[in-house]
Regions:
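Single conserved hydrophobic/aromatic residue that forms the stacking wall/gate
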Residues: 1-10
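Beta1/beta-strand and adjacent pyrophosphate-binding region of the FAD-binding site
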Residues: 26-38
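N-terminal Rossmann-fold NAD(P) dinucleotide-binding loop
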Residues: 41
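Gly/Ala-rich phosphate-binding loop of Rossmann-like dinucleotide-binding domains
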Residues: 45, 49
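Glycine-rich FAD pyrophosphate-binding loop
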Residues: 50-67
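N-terminal glycine-rich dinucleotide-binding loop that anchors FAD/FMN and/or NAD(P) in oxidoreductases
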Residues: 71-101, 113
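Feature captures the FAD/FMN-dependent oxidoreductase FAD-binding
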Residues: 97-174
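Flavin (FAD/FMN)-binding glycine-rich loop and adjacent Rossmann-like elements that form
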Residues: 152, 156-163, 167-454
Length: 454
């Protein structure tokens, strides 16, 4: 493959530029290429490989799981609608394997155990994969991608594939191919990021005996602490530290406002800010919260927790009307029920109260309620062999606030993987596969599709 750094893949905005070209070896030829090994990517790779398809996955970090492992995000968010297990299929396997290791408390999960679970599922499926391997370009023409260009530890190489699945979160592969996308809200503002953390030396029994009865109880002294100078910034929205095991906790605390997860300089500033702020959070917990008097920060994530960047425009945009009417679709690949959770991008007045009202009441479903996820949100317009699965799929910003979390990514990923296998085998455009046949295969894989009628 011949590639040029000055190709139209990259739009130079300002400053100097350098032009060079090189011959890139084609290291792999495969049926399905998966960019990204987070919850959507690993689900896609496993589902495609178990369908009898040759699969290669490139993951830029050192393990599968993305935010749930490298970024230390300690919770999946809800997998059920209170009655039915919505993340069935790949999510069922993950949950069962964590349970077998006694590594899932019902809320938080053991991050090292989750890494092993993903490793085992990927290896058993027969999918090929490489860690420490980042997609840095694509070769595409006429609405069809032919090659992904990757940078690994041994240098740059290309992968030729029939079908490509973008499960990078940010939609890096689809972006480099030129697919149309939206980003953030109407004014471009995106949800803040968080740097999650691991904590030790917590007396959970004491905390449970003394915790206040209120939403986000670990935040109840934040204002007092800010006024006392413990915090150099005011951020009252704090999910908190969740119990993982004996004295251990997973922290989802603090925000990096204004971070753009597609800009390395912005993410660098966010990481610096969040690591500095951990000292302030430690002081807060030690001084104000019972059971945390001796708590210590054991580790912070090696990746920034990013909630929102690009959403690629597909054959259908899942929207707030669909969410509110608990929509059912003919091409449904699953259903989901997590409330819309858009973290405020600042606290000038009333933002947190509005968020809590929306999350706890306006957008909260009753038990057994859910909304449908149509296959068409996985297929970006303009490309015959490209899927976007995970938080970069086609949805408006409000629904993205619900579906972006890990169980939603499992549902989308497994559908993209099986769909890609079908498209590769039949040499069919991803926009034209038989969705009823896809649904049958998803049910065989274990997916929850209550509205499918055979």
């Amino acid at each position: 493959v011949r590639s040029s750094a000055a190709s139209d893949v990259y739009k130079r905005q300002k400053g100097d530029s350098v032009s060079f070209s090189l011959d890139i070896p084609v290291k792999y030829g495969t049926d399905v290429f998966v960019a990204g090994g987070g919850p959507a990517g690993v689900a896609a790779a496993v589902a495609a490989a178990e369908s009898g398809t040759d699969v290669y996955l490139a993951e830029s970090l050192s393990c599968f799981g993305g935010m749930g492992t490298s970024a230390l995000v300690p919770v999946f968010m809800q997998m059920t609608d209170g009655i039915n297990f919505l993340a069935a299929g790949f999510g069922s396997r993950v949950r069962k394997m964590l349970d077998s290791e006694k590594s899932f408390s019902g809320g938080a999960h053991d991050i090292e155990a989750l890494k092993r679970v993903y490793d085992g599922l990927a290896e058993k499926s027969g999918a090929k994969f490489s860690f420490c391997t980042k997609v840095i370009g694509v070769k595409a023409s006429g609405g069809k991608i032919d090659y992904a260009v990757c940078s690994g530890l041994g240098g740059i190489f290309a992968v030729k594939s029939k079908v490509f699945i973008d499960a990078t979160g940010n939609g890096d592969l689809a972006y480099m191919a030129g697919a149309k996308y939206e980003k953030g809200g109407e004014n471009g503002a995106m949800m803040p990021g968080s740097l999650c953390s691991m904590w030790c030396s917590i007396d959970w029994k004491k905390w449970r005996a003394n915790r206040p009865d209120m939403p986000q109880p670990q935040s109840f002294k934040v204002k007092e602490a800010y006024e006392a100078g413990v915090f150099s910034f005011y951020d009252p929205h704090m999910t908190g530290i969740m119990e993982i095991g004996d004295g251990l906790g997973g922290g989802n605390i603090g925000h990096a406002f204004g971070v753009d997860g597609t800009d390395e300089d912005s993410v660098t500033r966010a990481l610096l800010h969040c690591r500095k702020s951990m000292r302030e959070y430690k002081n807060y917990y030690n001084k104000y919260l019972p059971g945390f008097e001796n708590a210590k920060v054991a580790a912070t994530g090696s990746a920034m927790g990013i909630r929102e960047t690009r959403r690629f425009v597909g054959d259908y945009v899942l929207n707030i009307d669909d969410y509110m009417k608990r929509a059912v679709f003919d091409d449904e690949i699953g259903r989901y029920a997590y409330p819309i959770d858009i973290h405020p991008s600042g606290f000038k007045g009333g933002e947190l109260e509005k968020h809590r009202m929306e999350f706890d009441r306006l957008y909260k479903y009753a038990k057994g309620e859910s909304y449908g996820i149509p296959y068409r949100i996985l297929t970006p317009k303009g490309f015959s062999n490209l899927y976007a699965a995970g938080r970069c799929a086609s949805m408006d910003r409000l629904v993205h606030g619900s579906l972006r979390v890990m169980p939603g990514c499992f549902i989308m990923g497994q559908a993209a993987g099986i769909g890609a296998s079908m498209a590769a085998a039949s040499k069919t455009s991803v926009h034209e596969i038989d969705t009823r046949e896809l649904q049958k295969k998803l049910i065989k894989f274990g997916a929850y599709l209550p509205n499918f009628k055979s």
